[in-house]
Amino acid sequence: MWINRLVKHPSYSVLRFYTKRLCTVSVKSLREFGVLPNSTICHSVYPRRTYVMGRAVINDILIKKSYSTHTVCAIDRSKDENNGSAYDKFEAKGIPIDVHTLKRIISSSGMDESEFSKSISYLFAKTVDPEPKDVLSLEDLSFLLSKLYTQRFQIRRICRDINAKYSEFWFKLFSLYAEKVDAKRNQVNLRNTKLDACEIFDANLMIKNFIELGQLGKAQKILSFILDRNPDILLSPKNADISTIVHFLQLRCGALAPYWKIPDNSEQKQGFLRKMVRLGAKNTSIRLSSTYKAMDHQTLLKIADLALQEKKLLNSEDLLSTLIQSFGHLGQTQILERCIEHIWQISPQEFPSHVVIKHRGCYPSSKILVSILVSFYFNDHDLHRGLSILDSFIKHYPDVKLDALFWRRLFQLSHFAWTPANDKKATSVVRCWHLMKQWYASKRLRPSVDYETLRQLYDIMKKTGNFPLGIDVLRSFKPGIERTRAENAGKVNNIIIKYQKCIIKELVNRGRFSAVREFIDNYGFDRKMTKDLNIFCANRMFLRSKKMKNKIENKKEREKVRLDSFDDDEDDGMIIGSLW
């Protein structure tokens, strides 16, 4: 069919027709596979690789340039042959970035702009396209940026090894990227020349990376870079970008809950002020900046007004979650309650269970419920109102999925709210533990192992001496612990050993030796650990017997001293009586 059409056209129009046809088919196929959206206005609804790979494919078609790492062979396949994810069909099969190349590029971050640009070109040639290039295009740098982000943990380790600043490397990379963005527009009327969807996504990717590093100042500069060039990106119904709004709420409206200072009642001592802790302080996957404050409260209300009207924004889980946290940080709990009622029809006034309610936004998720819990606790310093609303969500939205982060935050907050003087057995925390077990049992699921959750429950067990709680925790998490140990998770393994030793110590001290043997048999997990626990148990039993022996001997000694003292008093009495 194509041949017949080509024959009918004169030779000078064949190439034009072929190019037009191939572009049309390519774009159509990309849309069918979910790689290219029907409209590229809604920037952040689709992932960055949607725009990067889509733009790269079309660019290859138009200028006849084929990257050695781009595989576009699946464009004209039938739908039946494409059962995998859309990205798999266009995934870049690039060479992994080796350590030597990474060290060279990271070391160059301390050089001037030209030397750093040359190192980036060398890195691109080593990992993406072996064709030498003096200057990388913006598309090349965008593709390389995504590849570097996927290997950011390896890059961070290399930075530690060579004593280089990881954050400075990324900020130098952003400076180079911003320079190319400006050069693309020939530095003409930059404030009125908007960034395209891919450039916005790249900038937001770097903001996300700097937030993870706790480099909020650098993240603010990149956010300003976006806002200066796209001033309507926050409040325009047509051009609003979800990722940019989320980062604006996080950086300027207080929606970074891990930074919030929460009062810890469990560590309060009589006559002293309550200790203030941050929720993310024990999290090793992110770093926290030393300072954090919200700066823009007026724009928050405008964003909320837009979000409650636009369906696209209401369907964004990330946006609603950060919006809730912003209201919580601002202390506007009444506005927060009205927003929850407007979006999900959940009110502090309990609805009858038979009432059918419909949500106007996305279906509630763990991220949203965590934001609600943390926001109310931040203002109330107790969990009463947050748990009441949570109970309504679970009742009216039975399909809500509660992940490990939700339970981690619930145990953290319940632990912080626990006052030992009023509740010596921490019944509020134990109640949350039973709630978690009941939820997983109702869904016929096994709880996933989370280090922070295990640590919180271990602290409660140790402070209250509630070793049955520890045994129950190990019993519930046993399948997940066995799987995690097979993956050689060091932190989880260490906290499990603490559980085991604490429980064995309590059982030995109470003289329940048969229970100790049964515990080791059930929760030894492997031969080496069982051997170590038996040795620890034997040592504890030896110490206990030695302590008991010393206690008996001391008791006998005290009894002997008491009898000798009584005999001396009796002799003195007889002497005094005879003299009298």
From Swiss-Prot:
Keywords: Mitochondrion, RNA-binding, Transit peptide, Translation regulation. Residues 1-40 form a transit peptide. It is found in: Mitochondrion. GO terms for biological process: regulation of translation. InterPro entries: ATPase_expression_mit. One of its GO terms (cellular component) is mitochondrion. Belongs to the AEP2 family. Binds to the 5'UTR of the OLI1 mRNA. This is ATPase expression protein 2, mitochondrial. The lineage of its organism: Eukaryota, Fungi, Dikarya, Ascomycota, Saccharomycotina. The gene is AEP2.
